[in-house]
C-alpha cells in the first residue's frame, strides 16, 4: 500500500493509523488470529478505492470508494496469493466501510471504529460530532475507551 500511494503521505499515514487502531482494538477485544488477520489487511487496504475514484469521479467520496475499492483490492490480494476466503471478506469490508447500518461482524465493527478514530482527528471534528459518532457507532469496549481518552 505504501507503493500504491507513493508520494501521498496523507493517504499513507491515514491507513497506517487506521491499521494501528484496528490492531489495538482487535487484540484488546480478544479476536482470534484469523479474524484479526482479516481486520488488519482490511485496515491497510480500506481506502484502496480512493485513487480510482478520484480518477473516474473527481471525488474520494465514500460511496465511490465502496464501489471501486473491492476490485482493486481483490487483484492486489490475489497477486500476493492471499487466502481466497479472507480476500472475499476483506473486499466485502472495503465495499462497505462507509455503510454503518449493515455492520455484520466484529471485524467490520472494529474497522469502522478505527477509521472514525482517525477521521475525527484528521477532520478536527467538533465535540458534538464526536459525541454523536460515539453514541451511534461505537460498540466495542476498547473503541469506546479510546474515543473517550483521545477526545
Residue ranges and their predicted role:
Residues 6-16, 20-32, 45, 82, ...:
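Divalent metal-dependent phosphate-bond-processing catalytic cores, especially two-metal-ion Mg2+/Mn2+ enzymes
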Residues 1-17, 49-59:
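Active-site flanking loop/helix segments enriched in acidic
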Residues 76-80, 84, 88-96:
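Mid-chain, well-packed structural core segment of small domains
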Residues 18-21, 63-79:
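An active-site-proximal "capping" alpha-helix that borders the catalytic cofactor pocket
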Residues 36-58, 69, 91-98, 115:
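His-Asp-centered metal-binding catalytic motifs of divalent-metal-dependent phosphohydrolases/nucleases
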Residues 14, 37-40, 86-90, 110:
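Short, conserved alpha-helical segments within structured domains
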Amino acid at each position: 500500500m505504501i507503493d500504491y500511494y507513493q508520494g501521498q503521505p496523507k493517504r499513507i499515514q491515514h491507513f497506517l493509523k487506521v491499521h494501528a487502531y484496528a490492531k489495538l482494538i482487535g487484540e484488546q477485544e480478544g479476536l482470534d488470529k484469523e479474524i484479526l488477520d482479516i481486520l488488519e489487511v482490511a485496515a491497510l487496504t480500506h481506502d484502496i478505492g480512493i485513487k480510482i475514484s478520484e480518477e473516474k469521479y473527481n471525488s474520494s467520496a465514500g460511496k465511490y470508494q465502496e464501489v471501486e475499492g473491492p476490485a482493486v483490492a481483490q487483484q492486489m490480494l490475489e497477486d500476493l496469493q492471499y487466502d481466497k476466503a479472507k480476500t472475499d471478506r476483506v473486499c466485502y469490508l472495503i465495499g462497505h466501510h462507509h455503510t454503518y447500518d449493515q455492520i455484520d461482524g466484529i471485524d467490520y465493527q472494529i474497522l469502522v471504529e478505527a477509521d472514525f478514530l482517525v477521521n475525527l482527528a484528521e477532520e478536527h471534528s467538533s465535540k458534538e460530532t464526536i459525541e454523536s459518532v460515539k453514541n451511534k457507532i461505537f460498540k466495542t469496549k476498547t473503541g469506546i475507551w479510546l474515543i473517550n481518552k483521545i477526545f
